[in-house]
Amino acid sequence: MKEPSATAGTYDIEEVRRKYIGFETATAKGRYPVEHDAIRRHCHKVDDNNPLFLDSEYAKTMAQGAVLCPPSGWLALYFASLGPWPAVFEPLFPIVPTPGKRIVNMSQEVEWSARIRVGDHLSVRRRIADVFQKAVSLDPQAVWIVAEAIITNQRDEEVCVIRNTMLTHRTPEEQGQGARSKEPG
């Protein structure tokens, strides 16, 4: 299949949709298991004093039986990723061709399906859920990308899906409007 083109005047959103929607990366296992100290530091930073996240003795007496990870998509992604060192570039999604290269993160939502416990070993796979064109005042040919990070535990049970909606747009110069906007008025 020919690679979709994103050059001015030749962008084919339907071709891009056919090629990229449903694209999924291989599952990547996180470098480290879920650790209590990282959870504790996060809770102190955000002033979350829930004993299920902080007190291992208390957590043992509860139905969960262990300290839980707070429902934070970023914490889940941290534990499912390659960790802080050595630094490894992990793109949030495959590079979808678009007419513009400017990116705005429009929204993020997390859908939880299971609890994350200290000691769990998380993994992540990423997929493109949707690509569509929707005009905005910045660019009538803006492209929207919905990318998902699917987090699973060591039993391959899905614990959450982190869904990011991003808008890509062209600059006024890329749209051919740069000359008009610079005219004295």
Regions found by a protein language model. Name each.
Residues 2-107, 173-178:
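Hot-dog-fold acyl-thioester-processing enzymes
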Residues 1-24, 107, 111-185:
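HotDog/MaoC-like acyl-thioester-processing domains
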